Structures are given as C-alpha cells and as structure tokens.
Amino acid sequence: MPELVVRMGELAVSSTAGDVLVCVGLGSCIGLALVARHGRACGLAHVMLPESNGRAEEKVGKFADLAVPALVDELVRVGVGPRSLEAVLVGGAQMFAGNSGMEIGARNEAAVRAGLAAAGIPIHAAATAGNTGRTMRVEVGTGAVTAREAGAAEVALR
C-alpha cells in the first residue's frame, strides 16, 4: 500500500483504493480526515493553527478556517457529495506544560469542530487532547482510520 505523508499545513485527497494517507507527529496539530461513507474517497489535512485571520496562505491545510472548506472542495472535485462525508479528528494535545495559557491544541480542535458544524459534516470519532503525540492513518477504499499514541498500540477509530 503506497503511503502518502501529509506534512504540516498540507492536505491530500485520494480515490485510489490501497492508498494510505498518513499524518505523523500530531501534537497540538489536528489531523482531520474526511471520509466518504462508502470509503472510496478520503481526504486528510494536517492543521497547525485555528485561524488565518484573513491571511492568504499557500498551504491551505495550515489553518482550520481554510482547511475544512478546502478539503471538502477537493473531495467534491473527485465526485464525493458533501452530504456523504464524515470526519475523524486526531491530535490537539497540550504538548508543553509551560504553554498552558496558549492551549493551541484545544483551540485547533474547537476551530476544526466549528468548521465541520458550519459545513454540516458529522464527526464519527475523535482521539484528541492529552499530552502525547499521535500518528494517524486513513486507508482509501475501506475508509478505515487509525490513531497511535507514542509508545502505544494502534487504535481503530473508523
């Protein structure tokens, strides 16, 4: 199975069965998977920050307010109806105790959830918060989504 690594600020969409979309090192970032209910097309964004504040950004996956609609648009381009999408969220951890006032992970999660609510996309599952990094995998064709915390076993989310 070919792995397509989605780096910070990026997003990717595939409708090729057997592809695996992967986000590695999700700390305060949110891995946002949008999966067509039949699983034949999937998208993944590696969201770094909650808001673009009107800034134009080359990497549309960087900000939650840009990433959610961009990922939906990309899936529509490959023939997925937006009403058939469901979301899985991974990440949003509080990685550094000294940064508790910033709470970037929680703000990222809240912004992604708000974007999904505005788009009418239900959240199927989430593995968020805590204080450890995670890896997220999305299997195109089956729509299976897994998450693995550092030092732990992989867990099926969808």
Name the predicted role of every residue range:
Residues 1-158:
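Active-site microenvironment for binding and transforming phosphate-containing groups
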